Amino acid sequence: MGRIGVLTGNAGEIR
């Protein structure tokens, strides 16, 4: 799991 970013808006990107 990742954090909620602005690329996808879901917990998929690690920012």
From Swiss-Prot:
GO terms for biological process: hydrogen peroxide catabolic process. Binds 1 heme b (iron(II)-protoporphyrin IX) group per subunit. Binds 2 calcium ions per subunit. The keyword Heme applies. It is found in: Secreted. Its cofactor is heme b; Ca(2+). Its main location: secreted. Its EC number is 1.11.1.7. One of its GO terms (cellular component) is extracellular region. It comes from the Eukaryota. One of its GO terms (molecular function) is metal ion binding. It is an enzyme of class 1 (oxidoreductase). Belongs to the peroxidase family. Classical plant (class III) peroxidase subfamily. Removal of H(2)O(2), oxidation of toxic reductants, biosynthesis and degradation of lignin, suberization, auxin catabolism, response to environmental stresses such as wounding, pathogen attack and oxidative stress. These functions might be dependent on each isozyme/isoform in each plant tissue. This is Peroxidase 3.
